[in-house]
Amino acid sequence: MPNTPGTASTSTTLGAPTRIVILGGGFGGVILTRRLESLVGARRDVEIVLVSRDNFFLITPLLFEACSGTLELRHCSQPIRPFLKHARFIEATAHAIDLERRTVSLTVSEGTVQDLPYDHLVLALGAKTNERLIPGSSQAFTFKTVADAIVLRNHLIERFERADVETDPVKKRRLLTVVVIGAGLVGTELVGELTAFVDEIVRWYRTIR
């Protein structure tokens, strides 16, 4: 969101640097910050600020392997600060944007609210699942975070444990049925990793074949 022609900068001090605020610490936000750093360098007339609710960068393509257990969860994320050479990082959640005042309201540690002025604002907050498109999908699992991968993995193991002692073949099959909604990159990669995961653990359950 750049300044419009004839609009003054939000900088309150004469000669203060132009501030570029980037909201979102995912691929888009981090890569853009790195790119701007390479363009701006050590110039003092430009300040780059990256804001994210997490102080780590999640490598989402590795979540599939973390869910199946072929990769340790700690390898799925890296601290954000070491990625940055000149940019400032703020761990906070953005909850409001004032376009007239050119400020972003941030909730930082312990619920403290602060206003961050900007000259240029970039939104790189990623996507959110729209559960209203498919009735009942709010009861399904999502797959976007490390926590999601852990929950899904534990749920699958719990289902295998229940199926192992279930004598009714219909109920057993239902316990072992997994439906993945979405055939894009996430859906297809997840199905592949889950298949490998099931092939690996099924040999430990004597009543499941």
Features from the language model and the residues they span:
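Beta1-alpha1 glycine-rich phosphate/pyrophosphate-binding loop at the start
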Residues: P2-A96, V178-V179, L185-R209
